[in-house]
């Protein structure tokens, strides 16, 4: 079989390499990055393709009649037309669970950056202002203790559940809004509520769901209006969940105290985004999944998915 890697940059950090994949499919062509217009020509007559964010849709599939398997080097499938792949007989495999701990960790990294103001005070010390008294430009910013605060979670998959464990370790009350409440969740010590209750009671609200037809624009202007005044909103899931203009308005009005985000509607975040100029926005460039350990799991599972497909089994297929 012939394979193509369209975004090799994803797995070429540190000690990571594609040797495991190349051992399975010696006839493989690799590209560092691929624009949409080049996707179909580069796949060509290959049966296998590995992607991260490249879009695979009807237009691409119609030009790649030999394609049999798409390996997503990620968990999310927003960029794949799964139904079109099914019609064309193309199996799509993703990598579930590889970044659970890393994304939950980033969620609290954002929250702690907000609550402790550590970066601002670090700068004050390094600039020598501690000896002089911290001046107004650094601000004696109020720090926030998490003990006893209410932490709301929308979406209770593996990442949401791990985030709940961390919140409870900080002594927070945890509320969860999720589509399905499973019997196994009974021992988690969280309270399951509807969306309006989640909005009204959460001091901190963290999003942990995929972007679907039902969840796109979840944090709309109307939803933000139902939140506690001065609440904190965190998004380490998908940018499409949030109306960023409405969030900017909420930050400017004080309705939201802070917005911590690692995912955005358009990435990289455009220069004209209002979020870039707001002190209440704490932003990172969609890196929650890129810890050394998570990337190694990503590579291992991706290689395993390919090995399974070649053996006729089809592991982690999302469009059976």
Regions found by a protein language model. Give the residues of each.
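NAD(P)-dependent dehydrogenase/reductase Rossmann-like domain
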Residues: 297-298, 303-320
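N-terminal glycine-/charge-rich "phosphate-binding" loop or analogous flexible N-terminal tail
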Residues: 1-46, 175
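Glycine-rich Rossmann-fold phosphate-binding loop(s) that bind the pyrophosphate
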Residues: 156-157
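Rossmann-like adenosine-cofactor binding region
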Residues: 58-61, 179-274
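Phosphate-binding beta-alpha-beta segment of Rossmann-like dinucleotide-binding domains, i.e.
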Residues: 88, 96-150
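N-terminal Rossmann-fold NAD(P) dinucleotide-binding loop
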Residues: 160-161
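Short beta->alpha connector loops at strand-helix junctions that form conserved
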Residues: 32, 73-74, 90-101, 178, ...
